[in-house]
């Protein structure tokens, strides 16, 4: 079967199997997919993208919005470019497909150009790796693809994540004339009849059976938390402590400044914790979950479940809300937690008001106050700044690549979120709203080439570069105290000399500069169409971070 016809059969099968987007990176061995896309073999959203690394993280962003994307790359180093995005998707449990074009078996291991051993390249970081040799379109081909999509979605009983489908193509890689073109008997087109694989539904455990009575219980929600976290909190009286990217802020009900609780004498009274998602931002939270005297209930529908300290008392796939009335002792303790959070908020407000007003913490508050669309927070300092200083994100959708917590591909991820959320091109989003991505200067520089992706996609995206002159996150960790300022700047800071206005112009993005958070608020109140790079210099303010942590302890 001609390679283009095989590519067409693959794309049409993925279309009916539920793949929503195809991101195509150009190449010769992957060219059959290009011809098939041009011929309309895929009915969803198909877009060409130059940079494989950017395409990988755009797919991560799409998956974060609930889409099911596929990335098409050619053979050789193009496959390796996807490794950072595949790792992020694997640890964040995000479904996506990698369609890697390959040489046929007889051209591998013999010195052929652009040929390497790329089948199974991603090892344990993919849920499945399928190797397709050149073959006819058939139910067997569709069956392999159905298994790939099911594995990516975690069906019927696995964990969602990336899947590699390695597709070998023989020459010719261009369309060939069919018999029907020459007047001979027409060949019936291949019509895929895919297998639908349904996910298994977890049976919720009874709250009273696994959590039991508690006088000082908490719910801790990290990235990927159950949407039922707020319901559990309301039914049990357990205060809800939620990281910004947990999703548990939506609709309200979360207790802010969670570190004010767990690091204080009040936190030592905790006797039970229900954990959902993957909480990784706060060292005090991790210390709490490691306490041997604590009953820790992990709610995780997938294996391996999240239990960093190995201290879980019980693990369940799902949990019913409590049925019994809230205990008087629990209600009284929860009231004290809320009062402690209010007190911490007032003291943090006072610290910020007496400061310069030009720190990452001030910037986080300004962004939260002046935007209403989805937020994409850099996985280093920005997400921590929101966690420390922003009292409420009610109703906001917040994303952060905390699967591996790297700075890779943050701009590309934000572009994918724009595509998946209707904030690109002729947007379906509410008028005047945009996606706002907040990241440090090193994160922005690391993914600067994805500004081209933002412009080509018409992403309605504000990229706020909180420029603290290099790796400011390390100054708030032990490394900021363990070395001299000169050594710190040399080995940890790595300040970059970048003309951000010229950078934006080079890629066709709008530009603005915000000298202080108030100027940033004014800019964000005046949305534009397409991508905009906003350079916002901030101070590192290590002393302020330490003062706030003192307030929270």
Where in this protein do the model-derived segments appear?
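Active-site diphosphate/adenylate-binding microenvironment
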Residues: 7-12, 28-34, 337-432
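Thiamine diphosphate
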Residues: 46, 88-89, 95-99, 106-119, ...
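N-terminal cofactor/phosphate-binding cores enriched in small/glycine residues
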Residues: 2-87
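Glycine-rich, acidic loop regions that bind phosphate or pyrophosphate groups
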Residues: 100-148, 242-344, 454
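Phosphate/pyrophosphate-binding active-site segments
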Residues: 1, 287-381, 508, 514-522, ...
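Glycine-rich, anion-gripping cofactor-binding loops and their flanking helix/strand elements
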Residues: 64, 75, 80-81, 205-208, ...
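Glycine/aspartate-rich loop-and-adjacent alpha/beta segment that forms the canonical ThDP
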Residues: 120, 157-202, 522-553
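Short beta-strand segments
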Residues: 72-74, 95-102, 123, 133, ...
């Amino acid at each position: 079967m001609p390679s283009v016809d095989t590519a067409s059969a693959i794309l049409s099968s993925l279309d009916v199997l539920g793949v929503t987007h195809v991101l195509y990176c150009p190449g010769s061995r992957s060219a059959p997919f290009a011809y098939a896309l041009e011929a309309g073999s895929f009915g969803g959203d198909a877009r060409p993208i130059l940079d494989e690394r950017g395409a990988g993280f755009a797919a991560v962003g799409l998956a974060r919005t609930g889409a099911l994307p596929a990335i098409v790359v050619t053979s050789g180093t193009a496959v390796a470019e996807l490794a950072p995005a595949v790792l992020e998707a694997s640890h964040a449990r995000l479904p996506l497909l990698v369609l890697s074009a390959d040489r046929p078996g007889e051209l591998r291991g013999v010195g052929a150009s652009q040929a390497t051993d790329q089948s199974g390249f991603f090892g344990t970081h993919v849920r499945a790796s399928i190797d397709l040799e050149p073959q006819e379109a058939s139910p067997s081909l569709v069956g392999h693809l159905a298994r790939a999509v099911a594995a990516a979605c975690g069906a019927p009983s696995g964990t969602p994540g990336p899947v590699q489908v390695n597709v070998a193509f023989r020459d010719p890689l261009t369309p060939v004339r069919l018999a029907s073109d020459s007047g001979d008997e027409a060949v019936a087109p291949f019509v895929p009849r895919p297998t639908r694989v349904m996910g298994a539904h977890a049976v919720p455990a009874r709250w009273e059976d696994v959590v039991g009575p508690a006088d000082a219980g908490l719910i801790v929600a990290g990235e990927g938390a159950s949407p039922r976290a707020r319901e559990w909190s309301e039914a049990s009286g357990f205060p809800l402590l939620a990281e910004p990217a947990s999703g548990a802020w939506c609709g309200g009900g979360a207790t802010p400044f969670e570190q004010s609780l767990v690091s204080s004498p009040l936190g030592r009274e905790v006797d039970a914790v229900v954990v959902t998602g993957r909480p990784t931002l706060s060292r005090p939270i991790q210390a709490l979950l490691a306490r041997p005297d604590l009953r820790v209930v992990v709610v995780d529908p997938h294996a391996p479940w999240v239990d960093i300290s190995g201290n879980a008392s019980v693990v369940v796939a799902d949990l019913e809300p409590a049925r019994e009335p809230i205990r008087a002792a629990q209600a009284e303790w929860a009231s004290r937690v809320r009062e402690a959070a209010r007190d911490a908020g007032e003291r943090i407000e006072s610290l910020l008001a007496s400061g310069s007003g030009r720190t990452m913490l001030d910037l986080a508050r300004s962004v939260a106050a002046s935007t209403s669309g989805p937020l994409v927070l850099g996985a280093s300092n920005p997400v921590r700044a929101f966690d420390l200083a922003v009292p409420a994100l009610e109703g906001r959708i917040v994303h952060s690549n905390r699967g591996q917590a790297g700075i890779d591909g943050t701009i590309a991820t934000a572009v994918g979120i724009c595509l998946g959320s209707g904030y690109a091109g002729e947007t379906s989003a509410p008028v005047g709203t945009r996606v706002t991505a907040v990241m440090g200067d090193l994160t922005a520089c690391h993914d600067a080439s994805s500004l081209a992706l933002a412009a080509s996609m018409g992403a309605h995206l504000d990229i706020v570069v909180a420029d603290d002159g290099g790796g400011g996150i390390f100054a708030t960790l032990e490394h900021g105290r363990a070395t001299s300022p000169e050594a710190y700047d040399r080995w940890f800071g790595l300040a970059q000399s970048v003309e951000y206005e010229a950078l934006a112009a080079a890629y066709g993005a709008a530009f603005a500069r915000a000298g202080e958070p108030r100027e940033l608020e004014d800019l964000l109140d005046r949305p534009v169409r397409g991508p905009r790079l906003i350079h916002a210099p901030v101070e590192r303010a290590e002393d302020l971070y330490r003062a706030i942590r003192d307030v929270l302890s």
